[in-house]
Amino acid sequence: MKLFYGACFVLAAVLVVTSCNAGNDTVSGNNRASTAVDSNFFNRKIEGEITVSAYDSMSYRNFLEEAARAFEALYPGTKVNVETFSAMPEIRTGEQGGNQMMLVQMQDDPQGRSDFISRINTNLMSGTGADLYAMDVLPLHKFAGNGPLENLDSYMEMDPGFYRDDYRENILDAIRYRNGTWFLPLDYDFNYFTYDAALVPMQIGSGLGTEKPINAEDLLKIGMDLYDGAYKLFNLYDYSRSPRSMYNMLLSENIQSYLNLETKKPNFIDGSFAAMLNSVRDYGEQGLIPQGVTGQQDAGQLRQRMGAPTDRFYFKQYNAVSLQSQFTRNLGRTMRMVEGGMAAGIDSDDEIAGIEANADGSVPFSFNQGFGINSRSRNKATAWAFLKFLLSKEMQLSVNTLNIALPLNNEARTEKAELTFAGLFRNGGGVLNDQQRQALEAYQATVERLSDNINCYVVQDTSLNDMINQEAQYFFGGSRGADEVARILQNKADLYLSE
């Protein structure tokens, strides 16, 4: 039986990321930010009231409300208020062709995100902001450094109750930005590629694998040489308003050449952005990749793809959660996260081609949940204690965390994999047989090998994301040419970054 988690983000904005720290900003030496707390800070009694604010209700609300009640029970005399703002998505479950399905349909709301950011800015200026902020839509480049976020370096260094090696350390290294750590993710995600061993010759496939990052351009070059018209190169549609598509993949891998948040200089008009748009359209028109649809049709298209796949693709892109299927597919259980913009393909001969890298070779991660502390909070001690509580193994194993990312906590990541496999195989008492245990151990080892390559968190700005996504719709809808879109984006981004 296959369990498909369908995420159809109708009109969903691509998560554009625009500034990468590839691990060169270290904690030690002259780069260390000034210490914000001393050792006495951690002896304070955990008490009083704090507020946690997030935009995305689906990712945060249930989890935070559970955490708030548990934290209050652990620390009598505390109160944790939870604020979330976006509408909850429509969730439907069912069965199709023997496959269990869960379809999550979200309406994108650029204006809602903009209103939320404006509200946060107003609250911060008036001194009435929350104590903790989820970093789901807030622009880190505007909030870090001299902005309203607390530098957490000294908290992690001086707190005797915080153990850095409890977490994936290369993720903690990657999030350092402007000589500081301004938020902590609770989880992490990455993309990886597979190749179909029935289509890609062994001599080529042997050069791919878990140890070596690779980007889409490299795989497209390989695929072009092999292409014979019988099968398409990638399982991604040319364009979709959902986060997955060939356009979104190439944009994310190359965004740093189009936009530099540190210098506040956009670069959409040197020809490379327009060339990328035209190449994606050409791939679709030439039949090299599937051609997509837009708008509300995405949801229906996704439902059609939830059945048993009938097509093969030279290469496929997946997120980290789907990696489980690589090791359970021969045991009668698979779990794929099928997102809008993805075409389902036969995967019985798939082998791992590598973790996805940016065009410059850096290997990024994303996160589902992450939090920063308001530097003007009146109760930083309790805010920090709550953030540590969210990072604990117990909370990272909560059933209210969406299973779309890997826990940052090392013990939680190990245990969550075990629980997921036991649940997938419906074993009584959570005991796996030898074959299932081998699959679990192979999966865990592969997760860690791929994760070892991560060295970059690429800072994003949702307002710029929405600008780019809006103009891309005009191009793929046929109402504007690539050069016109590039010029408009150059002007819009330049105006926004100069504010």
Residue ranges of predicted features:
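Helix-loop-helix "hinge/cap" segment bordering the ligand-binding cleft or interdomain interface
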Residues: D153-Y163, L172-S245, E253-G295, S375-A381
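Hinge/lid segment of periplasmic solute-binding proteins
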Residues: R32-S34, D109-I117, L124, M135-F190, ...
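Extracytoplasmic/periplasmic substrate-binding proteins
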Residues: M249, E253, A274-A385
